[in-house]
Amino acid sequence: MGTSKKVKAYSILRVIAILLVLISHMTYYKVGNAFGGIDYLALAPSGTSFKWYFIFDKVRYVIYLFHMPLFMAISGALFALQIKKGRWSGFGSFAEAKWQRLMIPYLVFTLLYLVPLKYLSGYFGQTNFLMAEGSQLTLLGNSHLWYLYTLFLVALIAYFLVPRMQVWYLLPLWGIHLVSAYVGLSLISLPMEFLLWYMLGAMFESYRETLTSYFRTKRAVFLTIWLTAFIVCSLLSLYVGRFGIPALQRLVNDLAAVAGMGLTYLLAESLAQQKGFLESSFVKAVLLNGLGIYIFSDPLNYVLLRLGQALLGPAGMLSLGGLVLMMILRLVITGLAAYYLTRLFVRLWPNRASWVR
């Protein structure tokens, strides 16, 4: 399979991953920790039914099982392609490029965008501004920008591993991945957890042509296998959570992640063969502005939830109609707003376009 076809498959995976982020962020009504958070369930009047909310929240849970491992695997596969093409001449230039593309946006958008919007939404309550900034930068508070920090560290480590990559590497990496479930500091646990997926993506690229050719001969069979495995593992993940064993939960989640990524790749590879799919204006827009959409979209959810509470009330937000309305509004508004914010950022600061594209 030629390089252009590889790029098509990976490009479509990137589009799918961005859309999964938007979808998975449109359902939560409760999120946070000791440094701040939102809990619109607690504001609901006594007797309010949470049935529909919990059903929709299970969809979010299932997407979370694989969509961020998918993001990391795509990055690993693309890095393996770059290594094949001899793009990077040394670690210094590589580290500097990753710092500029990942860590500077992480710092800038956390300080100047994420925290101010969370304050506006009431997320931080009585937490002072310095504590709020510190908790987000150190990942002590939940921040969707953890991905930028994690990818930066993972990429630096993978720079030395990918050129020497062998299949047996996955075993110790999986061990590190499991141990991360017991590490309480996100600054350390997240790179430990996601290095496995980055390397798995790089490993997949080494065998991709052979595997893809084989998948094509039995496409329906593999689709059935991956779909069945994903459904079973997702249900099992929901079940084992009651035991409170982090390693067991991580193991089952890993199986679901692999099945979800396999299923998504088959879908992307099929779409890559559809003439004109990548040329559609929608797909091009998501591809070009994907990083910015990721950066700008999620904090807007907190603001929309506060507006929803003011207009519908907690009980109204939790009714079936309220849930559907809020999800549609959150998906459309955050997606469109993030897209136009990305374009505005590029127009105002063209020399910093790589921060969001």
Give the location of each predicted region.
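Aromatic-anchored segments of alpha-helical transmembrane domains
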Residues: 19, 23-26, 172-186, 225-239, ...
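Hydrophobic transmembrane alpha-helices
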Residues: 77-81, 154, 158-162, 194-210, ...
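Solvent-exposed interhelical
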Residues: 152-175, 183, 203-223
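Membrane-interface junctions at the ends of membrane-embedded or membrane-associated helices
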Residues: 3-4, 83-89, 163-167, 205-219, ...
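Hydrophobic residues within membrane-embedded alpha-helical segments of Major Facilitator Superfamily
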Residues: 20, 70-72, 197, 204, ...
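Interfacial loop-to-helix transition and helix-capping segments at the boundaries
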Residues: 56-69, 136-149, 181-200, 235-263, ...
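Alpha-helical transmembrane segments of multi-pass integral membrane proteins
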Residues: 246-349
